[in-house]
């Protein structure tokens, strides 16, 4: 929940794209799924309102909170992505989460090797097309006047 309060600081940098990965720490604490979803929606909206495209990193959690919680939690990310028209990384930690060789001793946070996999396999395939769209948009606005011009002789 702390990230929602820090978004103004993020928006001061005027990001074109923000990769948002929140909710897992709340789930570890057993925070109600509806509250987690509301916080994610608030964060996405604040970023969008600040002019940033959002890529939402989906999370999954261990089953220690029960199957109902796990299923409800997993459903948050695709639902928010669809409802708020944002790009989704289905599972941000795909290929890394749960692998002791790719995570620190806390079994939650990836190692350097784990992050390398996350970036190369999970982020870049989704981020690269978004960057290309932005580059095309910048090129279009640079070559086309934003308002009609009138010449007089």
Question: How should these model regions be labeled?
Answer:
Residues 2-153:
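Alpha-helical cap/lid subdomain in secreted, periplasmic
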């Amino acid at each position: 929940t702390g990230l929602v309060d820090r978004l103004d600081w993020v928006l001061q940098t005027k990001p074109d794209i923000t990769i948002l990965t929140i909710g897992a720490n709340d789930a570890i604490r057993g925070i109600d799924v509806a509250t987690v979803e509301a916080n994610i929606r608030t964060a996405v909206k604040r970023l969008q309102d600040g002019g940033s495209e959002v890529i939402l990193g989906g999370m999954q959690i261990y089953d220690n909170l029960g199957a109902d919680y796990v299923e409800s939690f997993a459903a948050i990310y695709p639902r928010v992505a669809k409802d708020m028209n944002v790009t989704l990384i289905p599972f941000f930690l795909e290929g890394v989460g749960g692998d002791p060789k790719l995570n620190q001793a806390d079994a939650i946070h990836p190692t350097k090797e784990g992050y390398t996999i996350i970036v190369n396999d999970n982020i870049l395939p989704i981020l690269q097309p978004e960057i290309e769209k932005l580059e095309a948009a910048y090129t279009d606005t640079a070559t086309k006047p934003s308002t009609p011009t009138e010449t007089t002789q």
